């Protein structure tokens, strides 16, 4: 007797009006996660998840596409206002912010939460190209 295929539960719509967008812009990729005030993930996207590979993931355009995607997914759950936490040294920081605004989100605060060492670990040696 064949097993009946398991039914995939449809993701229910959360009615959340405000959230927190965490933009992590590294040198290699840009990741955007939109959470509620408690930190539970509502939606996420990254340059790699949008189909960019290799060095194209670190471009501002890839960050813009990822932010638009995360913003649209969050808007389906009712998110209208966002606080933005930006971390990392990558090139996709500003373009991700502009794309979130273009997706119809109202940005209330922008915080730079990049971790800065108080002379902690020794950094990697300089590249010689």
Curated annotation (Swiss-Prot):
InterPro entries: Ribosomal_uS11 (IPR001971), Ribosomal_uS11_bac-type (IPR019981), Ribosomal_uS11_CS (IPR018102), Ribosomal_uS11_sf (IPR036967). The lineage of its organism: Bacteria, Pseudomonadati, Pseudomonadota, Alphaproteobacteria, Caulobacterales. It comes from Caulobacter sp. (strain K31). Signal peptide: none annotated. GO terms for biological process: translation. The gene is rpsK. This is Small ribosomal subunit protein uS11. GO terms for cellular component: ribonucleoprotein complex; ribosome. One of its GO terms (molecular function) is rRNA binding. It comes from the Bacteria. Pfam families: Ribosomal_S11. Belongs to the universal ribosomal protein uS11 family. Located on the platform of the 30S subunit, it bridges several disparate RNA helices of the 16S rRNA. Forms part of the Shine-Dalgarno cleft in the 70S ribosome. Part of the 30S ribosomal subunit. Interacts with proteins S7 and S18. Binds to IF-3. Keywords: Ribonucleoprotein, Ribosomal protein, RNA-binding, rRNA-binding.
């Amino acid at each position: 007797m064949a097993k009946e295929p398991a039914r995939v539960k449809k993701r229910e719509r959360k009615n959340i009006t405000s959230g927190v967008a965490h933009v992590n812009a590294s040198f290699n990729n840009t990741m955007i996660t939109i959470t509620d005030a408690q930190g539970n993930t509502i939606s996420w996207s990254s340059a790699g998840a949008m189909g960019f590979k290799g060095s194209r993931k670190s471009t501002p355009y890839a960050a813009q596409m990822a932010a638009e995607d995360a913003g649209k997914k969050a808007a389906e759950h009712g998110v209208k206002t966002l606080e933005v936490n930006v971390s990392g040294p990558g090139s996709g920081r500003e373009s991700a912010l502009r794309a979130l605004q273009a997706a119809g989100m109202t940005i209330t605060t922008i915080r730079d939460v990049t971790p800065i060492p108080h002379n902690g670990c020794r950094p990697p040696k300089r590249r010689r190209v």
